Every structure is written in C-alpha cells, then in structure tokens.
C-alpha cells in the first residue's frame, strides 16, 4: 500500500506551519509494504529545534484529523547528516529507503 497523493499534499501543507527544510516518508509506506494497521512514519528536518519533544507533539497535532496514525521524528540537518552514516540508525534506514516528500 502506498500513500495517496492527496494525503501526501495535505501532510506537507500542514507541516509547512513548522517551517521544515525537508520531510521524509519512511517505513512501510515508503517501501510499499504498509498494511491497514500501519502508521505513517515521517522525519521532519528543520534548522531550529527548541525542544525536540515539543516539536514532535506539535507536528502530531498538525496532522490530527487526517484519519491516520503518525509517528513523527524531528531532527536538525546536522543530526541527520551525522547519523545517516551510522549502522543500525533509523536515519540510515531513512537515507537508504525513505522518500523525500518535501524539500525547500
């Protein structure tokens, strides 16, 4: 199962309110193996992160009401660049199998 274009556009539209530089879709929706029980995994890359937990909560609030379950990670560009080379890190999985759905 893949993410519908209309839902992807709505996700991007809502998350633009937190000024992302890039948004990745990863996990089962990116690989085409999603089932009806799958959540939608997103990584939001943004320059200024005041509080990671607050940013993740804010992103989830923005996505509320779309009728899907979301798991949202937030990272700076520097964190993503550093950890995407680390074996076993979620950032490496994202760099290898994820899809960019928004970039400035």
Where do the protein language model's features map onto the residues?
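Catalytic core of pol beta-like nucleotidyltransferases
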Residues: 1-22, 30-36, 47-104
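Acidic Asp/Glu-based divalent-cation binding sites
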Residues: 39-41
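Short hydrophobic/aromatic beta-strand micro-patches
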Residues: 43-45
């Amino acid at each position: 199962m893949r993410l519908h274009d209309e839902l992807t556009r709505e996700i991007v539209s809502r998350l633009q309110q937190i000024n992302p530089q890039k948004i990745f879709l990863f996990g089962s929706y990116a690989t085409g193996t999603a089932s009806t029980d799958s959540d939608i995994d997103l990584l939001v890359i943004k320059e200024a992160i005041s509080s990671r937990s607050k940013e993740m909560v804010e992103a989830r609030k923005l996505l509320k009401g779309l009728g899907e379950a979301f798991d949202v990670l937030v990272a700076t560009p520097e964190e993503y660049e550093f950890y995407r080379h680390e074996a076993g890190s979620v950032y490496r999985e994202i760099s290898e199998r994820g899809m960019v759905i928004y970039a400035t």
